[in-house]
From Swiss-Prot:
Organism in which the protein naturally occurs: Bradyrhizobium diazoefficiens (strain JCM 10833 / BCRC 13528 / IAM 13628 / NBRC 14792 / USDA 110)
BP-aspect Gene Ontology terms: gluconeogenesis; glycolytic process
Enzyme type, top EC level: isomerase
Residues binding substrate, per UniProt: 10-17, 23-24, 62, 89-92, 100, 116-117, 160-161
Function: Catalyzes the interconversion of 2-phosphoglycerate and 3-phosphoglycerate.
Active site: H11 (tele-phosphohistidine intermediate), E89 (proton donor/acceptor)
Name recorded for this polypeptide: 2,3-bisphosphoglycerate-dependent phosphoglycerate mutase
One GO MF term: phosphoglycerate mutase activity
Keyword Isomerase: yes
EC number: 5.4.2.11
Catalytic activity, reaction form: (2R)-2-phosphoglycerate = (2R)-3-phosphoglycerate
Length: 207
């Protein structure tokens, strides 16, 4: 029986995470801490005895750099990798590049909270979580999931909100449930799937 392995990891801390800025499709790189988080993710996966056949990531530097560092720790630098904007972070539109405290001053605490935490209300010029799922989910179903079900050990390095789309399907969460799910930077989540694509086991490598 082939192993149906899927590992998800959010990119390590970025320069804009550190500065408390809305990032979205803007393209800052990792901080020193983010680099360390990505390397630690690779070491944790190696300690689990994992190797991969294929990887998927976004077109944004912070996710690609995270993937590269993980693969370096695994000794798998040449791993076939698909890069697709379907896995990009949620586009925060007019909020992109703004300090979160400054955004609260401009639009008010309640409005910014609605944009950040509601399922289907987008910020001006940007995407809601529902919009993000609408592009990430088809990519998962059409590209990533068939790879896993065909026995390819699959690693996905992406972003908090695009990974929420995958987790929503994997764990059968409601919109309310996925909104409450926080994903730490640089922490791998290991799923093993049944033949019908349901989750057989899950291991979160936090800590």
């Amino acid at each position: 029986m082939s192993e149906r392995l899927l590992v998800l990891v959010r990119h390590g801390q970025s320069e804009w995470n550190l500065k408390n800025l809305f990032t979205g499709w803007k393209d800052p790189d990792l901080t020193e801490q983010g680099v360390a988080e990505a390397r630690e993710a690779g070491r944790k996966l190696k300690a689990q005895g994992l190797v991969f056949d294929v990887a998927y990531t976004s077109v944004l530097t912070r996710a690609q750099h995270t993937l590269d560092l993980i693969l370096g720790e695994l000794g798998q630098k040449g791993l076939p990798t698909e890069k697709n904007l379907a896995l990009n972070e949620r586009d925060y539109g007019d909020l992109s590049g703004l300090n979160k405290d400054d955004a609260r001053k401009k639009w008010g605490e309640d409005q910014v909270l609605i944009w950040r935490r509601s399922y289907d209300v987008p910020p001006p010029g940007g995407e809601s979580l529902k919009d993000t799922l609408a592009r990430a989910l088809p990519y998962y179903v059409q590209e990533i999931l068939p790879s896993v079900l065909n026995g390819k050990r699959t690693l996905v390095a992406a972003h908090g909100n695009s990974l929420r789309a995958l987790i929503m399907v994997l764990e059968k969460l409601s919109p309310e449930g996925i909104l409450k799910r926080e994903l730490a930077t640089g922490v791998p989540i290991i799923y093993r799937l049944n033949a019908d694509s349901t989750v057989a086991s899950k291991l979160d490598l936090a800590g």
